[in-house]
């Protein structure tokens, strides 16, 4: 099973959403920044590393707010661990995505998110978490 971390970066009641490029797996889908946990790496360390690589920030990783195991149709599974990020150093810069966007909870529903993220997106929009 693939193990992944993702960040819920919050600023002024907005959440950062990121769109994959057309050259990535599941092109042009929206997601939260993050990535694969490497062998022997702790989830919080992976979260800090991914945010530095993808957005150029040094993040203070907050609480783990959700853990989802998703089975993809046709095979393959992923464990996603979502962490809240309220504080970070540096200015966010888009290093790998087609687009990054600060959105309200309700605006999340209008973006074409990865299937594995949909339950969390619905919970965020409904105010059930964070």
What are these regions (language model features)?
Residues 9-10, 17, 87, 102:
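Conserved hydrophobic "DFG−1" position in protein kinase catalytic cores
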Residues 14-53:
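Conserved Nudix-box catalytic region and its N-terminal flanking loop in Nudix hydrolases
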Residues 82-84, 93-124:
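NUDIX/MutT-family hydrolases
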